[in-house]
Structures are given as C-alpha cells and as structure tokens.
Amino acid sequence: MNKKKIISILKEKLNLKDIYVTEDNNHYEITAIGNVFKGLTQVKRQKKIYNPLIDLITENKIHAISIKSYSLEEWDKNQK
C-alpha cells in the first residue's frame, strides 16, 4: 500500500480541501482538512476516515493509522 492510494481513496470519498499522509512501513499518519469534519466529535471524524479504508485495514495492507482531522476554520487557527 502506498500513501498515494490512501490519498486518492479519501479524496474520492470525502470532500477534503487538503490531505497529507506520511508512511512508515504499514503505519500511516493522516492529516485531513475539510468542512466535512465541522461540528463532529473526534470519534465521528475518525469514522469518516476509517470507513473508506476499512477494506485495506481488514486485508492488513494498513496496520496502524494515526488521524488528525480539522475543519477549514480549525486548520486556519492551528496554522497561526
């Protein structure tokens, strides 16, 4: 599994402004930015990311994921 495939899947399934993925073997860190996360709890945000990737997780192509998710407003505040 490569990070380009993960980016492609998430961009196709979620309305994201930006997405960044880093990879270390089968461990991935995902930072996703989009208003799809606005008003959602952290658990619901993680589910939004996990759901499109569930087949890759169950097939052990992805072993572990660390997720950071931001609405556009949160991302803008975080960058200052």
Curated annotation (Swiss-Prot):
This is Uncharacterized protein BUsg_372. Gene3D superfamilies: BolA-like (3.30.300.90). Signal peptide: none annotated. Pfam families: BolA. Belongs to the BolA/IbaG family.
